[in-house]
Amino acid sequence: MAHGEPYYSSKPDKDFNFGSTMARRQMTPTMVTKLPKFVRNSPQVYDWIVRGLIFPTTGKTYFQRVVVITGGFEDGTYGSFAFDGREWVEIYPIEHLNLMSSLKLIHKANALQERLRLSQEEKATLTLDVQFLQHENVRLKELISKPEPRKIQMKWIIVGAVLTFLSLIPGGYAQSQTNNTIFTDVIAACKYSTETLTENLDLRIKLALANITISDKLDAVRQILNFAFVPRSHWLRTVFYYIHYYEMWNIFMFVLAIGTVMRSTRPGTDLITLATSHLSGFRMAVLPTIPFHTTMTLWVMNTLMVCYYFDNLLAITMAILAPILGIIFLCFMEDSNYVSQIRGLIATAVLIAGGHACLTLTGTTTSLFVVILTCRFVRMATIFIGTRFEIRDANGKVVATVPTRIKNAAFDFFQRLKQSGVRVGVNEFVVIKPGALCVIDTPEGKGTGFFSGNDIVTAAHVVGNNTFVNVCYEGLMYEAKVRYMPEKDIAFITCPGDLHPTARLKLSKNPDYSCVTVMAYVNEDLVVSTAAAMVHGNTLSYAVRTQDGMSGAPVCDKYGRVLAVHQTNTGYTGGAVIIDPADFHPVKAPSQVELLKEEIERLKAQLNSAAENPSTVITQQPTATLEQKSVNDSDVVDLVRTAMEREMKILRDEINGILAPFLQKKKGKTKHGRGRVRRNLRKGVKLLTEEEYRELLEKGLDRETFLDLIDRIIGERSGYPDYDDEDYYDEDDDGWGMVGDDVEFDYTEVINFDQAKPTPAPRTTKPKPCPEPEAETQPLDLSQKKDKQLEHEQQVVKPTKPQKNDPQPYSQTYGKAPIWESYDFDWDEDDAKFILPAPPRLTKADEIVLGSKIVKLRTIIETAIKTQNYSALPEAVFELDKAAYEAGLEGFLQRVKSKNKAPKNYKGPQKTKGPKTIIH
């Protein structure tokens, strides 16, 4: 195809026709076969470039031309390829702006087509799912049985109609309507007005004469009950007339019959009960007794009411005998059913006998109806024990809940205002970390623990005497070892290596005990409570109810920092023991030398006491006896007394806290500032430069000689004590503060107030070395060398003028000796990085005296940073600073503090005041 037709990979490529046509003509079938995988249906740019511009070429082939093709890929990038005769080689891409614009449009079109394809597939899938759901819906509808319409039998409709007809018959109080004319109405109105006027005049006369009798009061009450105050032309009169005409029972039975036919599940039984109640004359008195009946006793009652309609004496006799016969013949039933049947028969007997008595005496059963309702209300009121009672159906299901608390139907906002109160503040949020809690499981019981550092902290009484405990965290069980238990009720458990908690709790740097938060796991549920706390020595008290499993829970502040460990609950208040950073590390056992010193002191005290008291005192050694543990009344009384003592102490502390603002304390003045001698103000000033120190080391001076030279330099440079400014006045300074623990006086020193420069200590001049004959080499004998030094010192020419004695040898120490409490805190990565300076910043003295210890500490720091375990770091730094103190150098922790780079977890600065000279 050389010099043939131009090659085009696709129609878009032909349409755009980018690049050189000659290059397209150079395309061969081999080149076409090995073309890179460009975007389908996309244009390419063909270039015909000199070979030497692409490949390193020499000779005649430099000016040969090669085909270079540039195109886009599926991932949105593009590249250029040159054909070297065998294959296409990728070269640095050549920029063609037209090609890049075209490729962007093509990629965008391809992306839209892909999105369209995916949308169409998703639409087809959703359409198919909808069709499946429609078919499933139709199938499920066919399986559901359709409820048939309620059908009421005709016989019950007829019975309801009969009862309705009976209820519409006028009652016994109905009167026949007479023919009235306008004249009779006028006469009746005048008569009523005259009677009313007469009654009013009589009432006013009695009121004026104060002649009101009891009968008058009863008449007034009767008129109120009869609504005599309602005018005759009012619509209420018409309502009362029809109620009086048809009677209340007839209207109620009419409504109840219609409701029974429409809604009742047993319309036959209900309608027959209404009919027998109406025929017997008991009427409303029957309804309150219905809940006491069963199905059998209900039909017994209906039978007796029908019998009462025909023969009342026979019905009363059968009703009285019914409970007795039921007790005898129904004894085969179970207890619950037996009691229900007897209760229904007794209710039937009471209804028949009481109804007959009421009908005989008053002609109505209203009084019996009121008595039965009163008994039911009294029975219900006697069982209102809780805050509410539940009404259940026959199956035991709660159908209603009625509160027993009396509540106002109106004006209840007064009660709500009194109960809720007016908000006067806003409660703050507290930080909790449930991921830092775990459950401690021991054979004696369970408790709560929390993660802090590399330990699990809990209460000591939760661990007990166990060496190993089980730690439950997020449903998994781990076995852990008890590391340390201090004197407090706290235990520290080593966190297992395969246990990785999601959160850890830190100790509070600035404890705030005003408001505490207790969180723990109780029955696998997280419980949180917030309360105000008070401090009582090393314990806290707060009003929180303790449940089983809360011992060892963390007591935190509002920021989630640990303040104490929950331990006990006696009565109303809960208690916790305050936790300090010093509790995390065990107290080091005294060394053998210290033990021997204590033993010597104890023996000396015994000797002194024996010398003072010659009489021999025989002390009986306590014998270990094993007694069976028992609890008697005295032990219980002691426990109660202990609990009451703690509660009273807490109560006193709370009262004192409340009364603290009212107690005033007189302030006195103690002057400690004016005229006070300020000694050791030049502490920390370098007495030797690096050059001087290096020269002394090169001369090979030993330690004693080196310290003697430093003593002479101090004698030359030190001046008189510095005084405060005379203008400064401290109102709390009365001159007695000159003598204190921080001021050391030399009572043999004579202060010259003429401020003459003191004479430095005399210097001893060394004699010039004289040549001596060479001696044979002898073994090194330190004793002989020491004797020679003494003889050499005796040969020194002493001045004839009397001078002060030479200063005694001394050793220089920088500040106070390091104490372990200053190093015992939570170290982290920042503390480890800043504790040692960079190697170029170390002094020569540090490298010579502390070189090996510094290298060891650097190794410990690197290991701690890699493993994130800083437990060994405090002890290593303490040993290094202790060695520096013994060598007269400044401690590294003090150096960090002096540069304002104290560790962020640093417990407190050491109260150092610079170099201090100690005379041995």
Curated annotation (Swiss-Prot):
Q: Which residues form a coiled coil?
A: none
User: According to the UniProt entry, what is the EC number of this protein?
Assistant: 3.4.21.-
Please list the GO terms describing molecular function.
5'-3' RNA polymerase activity; serine-type endopeptidase activity; serine-type exopeptidase activity
Positions of the catalytic residues: 461 (charge relay system), 489 (charge relay system), 551 (charge relay system)
Please provide the Gene Ontology terms (biological process) for this protein. Answer: proteolysis; viral translational frameshifting
Reaction(s) catalysed by this chain, per the record, are: RNA(n) + a ribonucleoside 5'-triphosphate = RNA(n+1) + diphosphate
Q: Which residues carry this modification: O-(5'-phospho-RNA)-tyrosine?
A: 693
Regarding how it is modified after translation, the entry says: Cleaved by the viral and host proteases. The protease is probably autocatalytically cleaved.
Q: Which residue stretches belong to region Disordered?
A: 752-815, 900-920
Q: Does the keyword rRNA processing apply?
A: no
- Show which residues constitute the signal peptide: none
Which intervals carry biased composition (Basic and acidic residues)?
A: 783-795
What Pfam families does this protein's entry cite? Astro_1A, Astro_p19, Astro_VPg, Astrovir_pp_1, Trypsin_2
Q: Which UniProt keywords apply?
A: Covalent protein-RNA linkage, Host membrane, Hydrolase, Membrane, Phosphoprotein, Protease, Serine protease, Transmembrane, Transmembrane helix, Viral RNA replication
Please note every region of biased composition (Polar residues): 805-814
Protein family? Belongs to the astroviridae polyprotein 1A family.
Instruction: Supply the name of the protein.
Output: Non-structural polyprotein 1A
Q: Which organism is it from?
A: Human astrovirus-5 (HAstV-5)
The coding gene here is ORF1
